[in-house]
Amino acid sequence: MDSKESLTPGREENPSSVLAQERGDVMDFYKTLRGGATVKVSASSPSLAVASQSDSKQRRLLVDFPKGSVSNAQQPDLSKAVSLSMGLYMGETETKVMGNDLGFPQQGQISLSSGETDLKLLEESIANLNRSTSVPENPKSSASTAVSAAPTEKEFPKTHSDVSSEQQHLKGQTGTNGGNVKLYTTDQSTFDILQDLEFSSGSPGKETNESPWRSDLLIDENCLLSPLAGEDDSFLLEGNSNEDCKPLILPDTKPKIKDNGDLVLSSPSNVTLPQVKTEKEDFIELCTPGVIKQEKLGTVYCQASFPGANIIGNKMSAISVHGVSTSGGQMYHYDMNTASLSQQQDQKPIFNVIPPIPVGSENWNRCQGSGDDNLTSLGTLNFPGRTVFSNGYSSPSMRPDVSSPPSSSSTATTGPPPKLCLVCSDEASGCHYGVLTCGSCKVFFKRAVEGQHNYLCAGRNDCIIDKIRRKNCPACRYRKCLQAGMNLEARKTKKKIKGIQQATTGVSQETSENPGNKTIVPATLPQLTPTLVSLLEVIEPEVLYAGYDSSVPDSTWRIMTTLNMLGGRQVIAAVKWAKAIPGFRNLHLDDQMTLLQYSWMFLMAFALGWRSYRQSSANLLCFAPDLIINEQRMTLPCMYDQCKHMLYVSSELHRLQVSYEEYLCMKTLLLLSSVPKDGLKSQELFDEIRMTYIKELGKAIVKREGNSSQNWQRFYQLTKLLDSMHEVVENLLNYCFQTFLDKTMSIEFPEMLAEIITNQIPKYSNGNIKKLLFHQK
């Protein structure tokens, strides 16, 4: 028996037997074929040929395959059968095949689906292959058909190593005698693997003028590749039976078997070719054509320490001259002397970590500001005329990589933090109308005041006003302008103050000459902070249109229905207005609803009286710009009595010549004029808010009358008007409840108004309402 075992299939029906040494181990190639279940193959199994040879450094699985006889008939690739017989089929879909970069012949490959093939079918297909293969006595016979462009035997000794894993024999019987199969086509009988290796001019082959494998560079025992001098050497499979080998995954094609057991082969042109996948990693440079599991080591450079290593082209090849690399990091070497490598799984070369380039490290250290001298405290920036403060942004002087100017000019390069607009938080352009704002808010406020726009928020009067959303809600923006203290009078006041300061400067100069004089200062300065009255001006609802068609003859039913529909929309506007009143939303939610249910008629009647007073001098009732009740319409049935009560309000406003500020304060007090007998849930807060607006009414009176002795008298008259509103509203509500309950009148009510009336009727009938009066009757 030779030192290696040979697999010699016969031409009989039964496959050839497998010979093994006594010390030979049976390797488990089907470790992961069935989800981890181990399938041991004995020496008598006809499906595998396994031989073991004891060696001090490695164990080799030696399998002899014929070099192949030349035949004119082109034969497909046999990698399927050999891969299966060697245990390389495991069903992984992530396997990477790399070989075309090194000049391997592109052969078609046939694979079996692991989900559709069982072990019996596998053994039967291998047995068919074994019957059709034969081992020629002279392995050199295949060299007779080499093409003229191939290297000579002297330069490249014929070996059977490089492509043994991808080129195997399939059954090629023709007739009864059968026929020989060839490994390659006519143009692929021999191939030059050195053409794609791109060796430099000083390659071993050119220096020795003989076979490149006989160089001392490759004979060194520390190298990965050993000289392939043995012409009769079978290709070797280096591996450990305990390794978790991930084999080559072939294209998923199910073999077709004839009735007589022959295997039907597909055309090589239709088979998917193996593709090369090169993975690149940052700052990793491989100096050996070995298989390396690459890992990032940070921003450092790695240099391999293999002697005699060459870069194959400019690519980081993950495959050697002989072998297949898988995604798991393992590689199967053929005809390779790996005695210098440790028999460990996922073997990696030892890298020498080279420090980073000094320039990069210096820049990094500078950017990081290492060193106490390069650090600048964020809270120790001093500016002329300012106290020490802490800022949260990085100025140029804080950056160590920027050369700091002399201390005398350092304050010129580092300015204070940018000033922000108090309205939208954009970068402020200056002090406009008494407030530090941007140019956009300045123009907006001027147009809003001069245009007398009555903005109404579509939300809850708490919209976010910033640089991006400042144009979404003009009502909230205008309110925020007033809250910030913007005032058109501030511009005039600023000019006055400037003139006074100039006069003061002139007087101070005279005072310096004559110490007996005293400096003249203004007695009072106008208040620039917003007041509650200014906020009430902002939130005042706009005038609504009734949509009444005056071309159609008037009728009581049509006018009353139109007024109810208009009243429903006015109630909705009143709810939004009440929620925008400062302090009202701080009340309990139930208290807010109760106050609105008790005061909705107060608000509508008082607003109607104000419009009638301002537009018609209390002679007409101006419900809306398109619905004005004149004397002719007042004569309609059931109209005069109600119009008489409403005309009383407008006539009192006209008699007292109520100002707009007084009207706004009185209207707010009417919202707070009726409460339940049991009180509110937040009664103390309610009393505080009500007293606040009573004081605002007094301020409005003082603003109108000045420091006059008539202020208290006017306050008495205005509060008397507020008390009289209870009687007016009571009469209006009685008529409203009557028309609501009397279905024969067929007067329509909007849904929200009908809900309020339904909830309010039992409270009025039970007397569960407490009137808050200023004067005793």
From Swiss-Prot:
Domain remark in the UniProt entry: Composed of three domains: a modulating N-terminal domain, a DNA-binding domain and a C-terminal ligand-binding domain. The ligand-binding domain is required for correct chromosome segregation during mitosis although ligand binding is not required.
Region called Required for high transcriptional activity of isoform Alpha-C3, residue ranges: 98-115
Outcome of swapping K703R: Slightly reduces sumoylation. Inhibits the stimulatory effect of RWDD3 on its transcriptional activity
Effect of V571A: In pseudohermaphroditism; female with hypokalemia due to glucocorticoid resistance; 6-fold reduction in binding affinity compared with the wild-type receptor
Positions bearing Phosphoserine: S45, S113, S134, S141, S203, S211, S226, S267, S404
Residue ranges, annotated region (Interaction with CRY1): 532-697
Biased composition (Low complexity): 141-150, 394-414
Record GO biological process: adrenal gland development; apoptotic process; astrocyte differentiation; cell division; cellular response to dexamethasone stimulus; cellular response to glucocorticoid stimulus; cellular response to steroid hormone stimulus; cellular response to transforming growth factor beta stimulus
N6-acetyllysine: modified positions: K480, K492, K494, K495
Record annotation: effect of changing K494A: Decrease in acetylation and in repression of its transcriptional activity by CLOCK-BMAL1 heterodimer. Complete loss in acetylation and in repression of its transcriptional activity by CLOCK-BMAL1 heterodimer
Placement of covalent cross-link Glycyl lysine isopeptide (Lys-Gly) (interchain with G-Cter in SUMO): K277, K293, K703
Further information: Can up- or down-modulate aggregation and nuclear localization of expanded polyglutamine polypeptides derived from AR and HD through specific regulation of gene expression. Aggregation and nuclear localization of expanded polyglutamine proteins are regulated cellular processes that can be modulated by this receptor, a well-characterized transcriptional regulator.
Chain positions found as Omega-N-methylarginine: R23
Result of altering L773P: In GCCR; reduces transactivation of the glucocorticoid-inducible tumor virus promoter; reduces affinity for ligand; delays its nuclear translocation; acts as dominant negative mutant
Name assigned to this protein: Glucocorticoid receptor
